[in-house]
Amino acid sequence: MTSIINQRWPLGNLMDGFPNGEKQNKLSFGGVPEKGYFEEFNKDPKYISFSGTPEKAYFEEFNRYRNIDEDDNRDTFPLFNEISSNPESESYLQTFVDNVRINTDINFVSKTNSFSQNDLSYLNATYVDKSLSLELPIKFNWAKTTSADSPDVVAKKKLISKPDNQYLCGSCWAVSVAGVVGDVFAVAGLVNWVPNISATYALIHYPQGRCKGGDPATLLYNIANNGIPSKHCVDYSWCSQNRTCTTADSAAHFGSDLSPLIPKDRGCYFDSEHYIFKIDSNIRTIVAGSGAIDVSNVQRTIKEYIYTTGPAVGGYIIFRNFTSKVPFGPHKGNSTFNVINGGVYLEKANYAQYRGEYGEHITEGLTFSSSNTDSDNYAGGHAISIMGWGIQPRIRVGNGPNDIADVPYWYCRNSWGTKWGMNGGYFKIAMYPYNRKSQFSKIVELMTPQGQHIRLGGVLAFTVSNPPVLKKLPANKQPPNPNSLSKLLDYYKNDEDDIVTKLPNIVPPSDGKKSTTSKTNNWYIYALIIIFILIIFFVLRK
């Protein structure tokens, strides 16, 4: 059955090939350098370029970390608090880690249709119908519950995905999409459990560049056409339980690409039933200057979409200062912006030069320079999940004594683990115009020092209309080694085969797991019917 939503947002055109035939300009998300694979070491062992950004990297630094003791385990990745007492060496290593986790292009517009006037009208009508208000809340966040939330919203927030860790595989294009797809099903009331969509399934079946990056828009079309299961089928154990993918000795493997670690078999771990999630094919890009969206309505449109539909996939430019680290103390290894000046990332801030105290309330000592957004400081592109928005009061935005402002921000879920960021893996990023390049609202064009043309920006929008379908999926020929998995075997043997309801006001159990209430209620109904029939039978016999 075709939904009203599908009629409103018809299938966008999926472009084959590249704009103007310029294949060399085609980049991919994922956090893995386009240039700088292992052969680059053979050409010049003293110099290598990651993500189009030159890095001074000496081959000896890689050799130094090839045989790290087992004590330096993945618990500290990606912060590497225990690696070395040599700050310079640690800085080299962290630079490589930062580059491998960052994507290199977010050109959603080339893959999807623009947000049309019909789309905009439908979204506005949906928002007004749901909120009974013309005013959006000043702050809203799918990752946090508040006293202002209705019971329905609280129930759905319990089903929202938590931050994952992509580790050293450049898979944020898959991890961000997997999280958001599950979130949108939860917000739509089509599931009463945390979906936990499998990013690994995407890397296997819709691989693109796998650990070398990919395009979230293309992946969404794949999911619309063919679906995707949960982590019960296959999860991220191939990386999270593999030292090569999680620890500092991975530095020796950056050039050789971690994609071969991804499972070769295309089946699930076990021959069992799993829920298949399919999204509607109405994938759109919300970005100013495209379709019915301009600077005047882009932020409200993104907010309305998130408020009514759920978290969204956003793409943005990362400059070097985004990953500038706290050098010491309890926050060591975290990006500096997370722990000062309200925790809001401002693209022109000199985070690398900051040497003051740490704390979100600290605003003094932070300086600003426009050079931070020069093309020389371009590090890559990144795909994340936008969870909501807010306003950070009275933070520093410039070098003047009166450069203090209430700054609107997007609240985002990253894929760098729970030890990075704030509140266990999240971060705030200033909205346009406080950030004019590192933001979601506008397309930004940039030329790298290597002459590579970059076009980034936008928010992907889609809907879901039908609940996931329980389906038996093929299993791998060989069962997995239990020691190589992150969970007990029973977790992977099936999804709980409860009834999936489409009621919009579904209230899940408090632990966020799937409910068997529906099945229990059905047995009561069947028993009552049988008793009623027996009573009628005996009455008629008399």
UniProtKB/Swiss-Prot annotation:
GO terms for molecular function: cysteine-type peptidase activity. InterPro entries: Papain-like_cys_pep_sf, Pept_cys_AS, Peptidase_C1A, Peptidase_C1A_C. It comes from the Viruses. One of its GO terms (cellular component) is membrane. The chain crosses the membrane at residues 520-540. It is an enzyme of class 3 (hydrolase). Its EC number is 3.4.22.-. The active site is at C172, H382, N414. Keywords: Hydrolase, Membrane, Protease, Thiol protease, Transmembrane, Transmembrane helix. One of its GO terms (biological process) is proteolysis. Its main location: membrane. PROSITE patterns: THIOL_PROTEASE_CYS (PS00139). It is found in: Membrane. Probable cysteine protease. PANTHER family: CYSTEINE PROTEASE FAMILY C1-RELATED (PTHR12411). This is Probable cysteine proteinase 361L. It comes from Invertebrate iridescent virus 6.
